[in-house]
């Protein structure tokens, strides 16, 4: 907690800033059949360019990657394989339908139990872009169940889910997340978030700068904000 009463992400008592990237397990030559050599090349190149964090978008990665991240000192946001992209339609999956509880919980537990002993893992992500509305925080909502299970199983790590940033200060059991995250916010929106002293949670722009070809823009403007408002 800083002097303004805002929470901070700290590792071993030291405040940190994630300089991260989303990483899919694909290769330009081998497709999804990537080798240990491919993974090693990826992570060593990231270290070379001062990338210190990876979000495993959007599923747990090859176990070899986590051991290498432990060795190289790269933080991991480990993401549950729960994604639908159907949130904009009336059938909204998985939403508040209890039929999805078992499958989402199974994937969450498999990830946590497999990767819990890796010191590189500092964040558990509940999923990606599945459920575009806010539902009651009760046993019918699959992500409420999974976030409460994570909190009980491993309270030492941070929980995140950019589709549901509800939290109650001082009571993690009444919160969906421990860190606020967003995707594809504009520069002005990001600056408003980080300069508003009423926002108490740490903040991550978990997806931005997505481009096809060379159409990327505003990268410097984003990073000016990240560096000026750490």
Residue ranges of predicted features:
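N-terminal carbohydrate-binding accessory modules
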Residues: 1-46, 67
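Substrate-binding/catalytic cleft of secreted carbohydrate-active enzymes
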Residues: 45-46, 53-230
């Amino acid at each position: 907690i800083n002097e303004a009463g805002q929470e901070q992400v700290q590792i071993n008592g030291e405040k940190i800033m994630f300089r991260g990237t989303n990483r899919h397990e694909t290769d330009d030559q081998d497709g999804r059949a990537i080798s240990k050599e491919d993974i090693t090349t990826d992570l060593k190149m990231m270290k070379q360019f001062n990338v210190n964090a990876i979000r495993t978008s959007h599923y747990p990665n090859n176990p070899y990657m986590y051991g290498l991240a432990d060795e190289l000192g790269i933080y991991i946001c480990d993401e549950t394989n729960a994604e639908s992209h159907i949130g904009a339609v009336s059938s909204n999956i998985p939403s508040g339908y209890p039929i999805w509880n078992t499958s989402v919980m199974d994937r969450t537990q498999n990830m946590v139990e497999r990767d819990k002993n890796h010191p590189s893992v500092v964040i558990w992500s509940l999923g990606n872009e599945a459920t575009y509305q806010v539902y009651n925080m009760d046993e019918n909502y699959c992500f409420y169940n999974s976030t409460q299970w994570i909190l009980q199983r491993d309270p030492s790590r941070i929980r995140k889910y950019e589709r549901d940033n509800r939290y109650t200060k001082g009571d993690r059991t009444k919160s969906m997340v421990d860190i606020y995250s967003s995707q594809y916010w504009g520069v002005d929106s990001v600056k408003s978030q980080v300069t508003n002293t009423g926002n108490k949670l740490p903040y991550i722009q978990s997806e931005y700068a997505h481009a096809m070809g060379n159409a990327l823009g505003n990268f410097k403007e984003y990073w000016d904000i990240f560096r000026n408002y750490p």
